[in-house]
Amino acid sequence: MARITVQDAVEKVGNIFDLILVAARRARQMQIGGKETLITKNNNDKYTVLALREIEEDLITKK
C-alpha cells in the first residue's frame, strides 16, 4: 500500500481544497488515457496516489 503525506502537496498547491481539485483532475487525465504519468508507476499505485506524488515533486501545478 502506498503511504503518502498530503502536507507536502498542500504546501505546493496552497490549500487542501485546491489540492483535491488538482489531484482529481490529474488522476482523471491519467485514467482516461489522455495524459501519461510523469513519474514511474510503482507497486500498482492508483492514479490518485500518482497524482499526489506528481504534485509533491512539482511536476503538476495549480494552473
Curated annotation (Swiss-Prot):
Extract one GO BP annotation from the record: DNA-templated transcription
rRNA processing listed as a keyword: no
- How is this protein annotated for GO cellular component? DNA-directed RNA polymerase complex
Coiled-coil-forming residues are none
Q: Which domain of life is it from?
A: Bacteria
* Gene Ontology MF annotations: DNA binding; DNA-directed RNA polymerase activity
Sorted alphabetically, which keywords does the UniProt record give? DNA-directed RNA polymerase, Nucleotidyltransferase, Transcription, Transferase
Description of how the protein assembles with itself and partners: The RNAP catalytic core consists of 2 alpha, 1 beta, 1 beta' and 1 omega subunit. When a sigma factor is associated with the core the holoenzyme is formed, which can initiate transcription.
Family that this chain belongs to = Belongs to the RNA polymerase subunit omega family.
State the function annotated in the UniProt record.
Promotes RNA polymerase assembly. Latches the N- and C-terminal regions of the beta' subunit thereby facilitating its interaction with the beta and alpha subunits.
Q: What is this protein called?
A: DNA-directed RNA polymerase subunit omega
> What is the organism of origin for this protein?
Blochmanniella pennsylvanica (strain BPEN)
